């Protein structure tokens, strides 16, 4: 740490504390993520190892945050990243109104280029959300925080935990306890982020997993084996029954959004993971080639992380799984009235 001068604290994520720092010799500004170990014999935490492995296995890409160095410090170690001025969550919080369509297209285009690059390298991020999409001083968006990333198995033979992705951006198969999944979980998250940019607020702001499913089925309708054949194979299928809910047209959810945007959004927000549009294919969608065209990064808003007015939106949800099947319904739900219309009695 002697080679760096700490300039301030940026924040604290699920996988470590992040500081803004300056390299003493070169003057380069970086972001230092300090990861502590409880005991030296523990070795590196799995999530930290995944982040290092994922970033080191991928060649430099302008849409993925650059890992510059890794070094031990005290009872842990430090990751040195290129410094990014802000993140997409701050952009949404500080926007006085929904972003201009050209701005939404630009952010989404950069996100899709980063996701396409990750998926081409067999990396599933598993925690895409606005707070993990960093913004540089020049307006460039880059994907960060690969602490939950995994190299996925194309043949679907590997089992993974379903407790990944922040709840508002968590794919339905994860909410149903899926242990076998692929890049489709990232594509659902991209759809949620796109919807949030178009709407100015999250589409599915559930306070627990059941409420999250209720928000989803209120728009997509109640899932069934005819629409989603793999549904019956999921571990948590039939643990709770939902009333039949017909899909809501996206033009009613987002009445001021263009047909092209709604068409692309609808191709991300699909129950069957294999039917969701791939990031590389989405980049060729007519949405990006109709007026207004994507804005140049220099035309995008860049709010500061520190200082400025207090954010209007409340903090995002935690990663923890706070619904228990055996617990009484009223004890598991923060807002029972919101989901009661969707739940079958008895």
Curated annotation (Swiss-Prot):
SMART domains for this protein: S_TKc (SM00220)
Described function: Required for high-level Shh responses in the developing neural tube. Together with TBC1D32, controls the structure of the primary cilium by coordinating assembly of the ciliary membrane and axoneme, allowing GLI2 to be properly activated in response to SHH signaling. Involved in cell growth. Activates CDK2, a kinase involved in the control of the cell cycle, by phosphorylating residue 'Thr-160'.
Keywords: ATP-binding, Cell cycle, Cell division, Cell projection, Cilium, Cytoplasm, Developmental protein, Kinase, Nucleotide-binding, Nucleus, Serine/threonine-protein kinase, Transferase
Boundaries of every Protein kinase domain copy: 4-288
Binding-site residues, ATP: 10-18, 33
Principal place of residence: nucleus
Pfam families found in the cross-reference section: Pkinase (PF00069)
The protein, known as: Cyclin-dependent kinase 20
Any one annotated GO CC term: nucleus
Family matches, as PROSITE patterns: PROTEIN_KINASE_ATP, PROTEIN_KINASE_DOM, PROTEIN_KINASE_ST
Keyword field contains ATP-binding: yes
Quaternary structure (record): Monomer. Interacts with TBC1D32. Interacts with MAK.
Catalytic activity: L-seryl-[protein] + ATP = O-phospho-L-seryl-[protein] + ADP + H(+); L-threonyl-[protein] + ATP = O-phospho-L-threonyl-[protein] + ADP + H(+)
Active-site annotation: 127
Top EC category: transferase
Chain's gene name: CDK20
Family per similarity comment: Belongs to the protein kinase superfamily. CMGC Ser/Thr protein kinase family. CDC2/CDKX subfamily.
E.C. code: 2.7.11.22
Locations listed in the record: Nucleus; Cytoplasm; Cell projection, Cilium
Biological processes annotated in GO: cell division; embryonic brain development; embryonic camera-type eye development; embryonic skeletal system development; floor plate formation; negative regulation of smoothened signaling pathway; neural tube closure; protein localization to cilium
Any one GO molecular-function label of the UniProt entry: protein serine/threonine kinase activity
């Amino acid at each position: 740490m002697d080679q760096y001068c700490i300039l301030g604290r940026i924040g604290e994520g699920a996988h470590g504390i992040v500081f803004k720092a300056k390299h003493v010799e070169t003057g380069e500004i970086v972001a230092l993520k300090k990861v502590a170990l409880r005991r030296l014999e523990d070795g590196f935490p799995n999530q930290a190892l995944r982040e290092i492995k994922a970033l080191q296995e991928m060649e430099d890409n302008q849409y993925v945050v650059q890992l510059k160095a890794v070094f031990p410090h005290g009872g842990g170690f430090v990751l040195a990243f290129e410094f990014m001025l802000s993140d997409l969550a701050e952009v949404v919080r500080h926007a006085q109104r929904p972003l201009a369509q050209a701005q939404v297209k630009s952010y989404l285009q950069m996100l899709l280029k980063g996701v396409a690059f990750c998926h081409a390298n067999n990396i599933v991020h598993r925690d895409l959300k606005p707070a993990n999409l960093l913004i540089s001083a020049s307006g460039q968006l880059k994907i960060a925080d690969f602490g939950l990333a995994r190299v996925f198995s194309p043949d679907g033979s590997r089992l993974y935990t379903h407790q990944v992705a922040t709840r508002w951006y968590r794919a339905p198969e994860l909410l149903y306890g899926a242990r076998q999944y692929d890049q489709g979980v990232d594509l659902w998250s991209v759809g949620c982020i796109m919807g949030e940019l178009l709407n100015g607020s999250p589409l599915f702001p559930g306070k627990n997993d059941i409420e999250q499913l209720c928000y989803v089925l209120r728009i997509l309708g109640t899932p069934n084996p005819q629409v989603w054949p793999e549904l019956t194979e999921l571990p948590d299928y039939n643990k709770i029954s939902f009333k039949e809910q017909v899909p809501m047209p996206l033009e009613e959810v987002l009445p001021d959004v263009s047909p092209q945007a709604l068409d692309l959004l609808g191709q991300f927000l699909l129950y069957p993971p294999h039917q969701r549009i791939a990031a590389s294919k989405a980049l060729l969608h007519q949405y990006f080639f109709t007026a207004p065209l994507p804005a140049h990064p220099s035309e995008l808003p860049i709010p500061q992380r520190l200082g400025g007015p207090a954010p209007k939106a409340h903090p995002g949800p935690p990663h923890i799984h706070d619904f228990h099947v055996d617990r009484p319904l009223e004890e598991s739900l923060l807002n029972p009235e919101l989901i009661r219309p969707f739940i079958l009695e008895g």
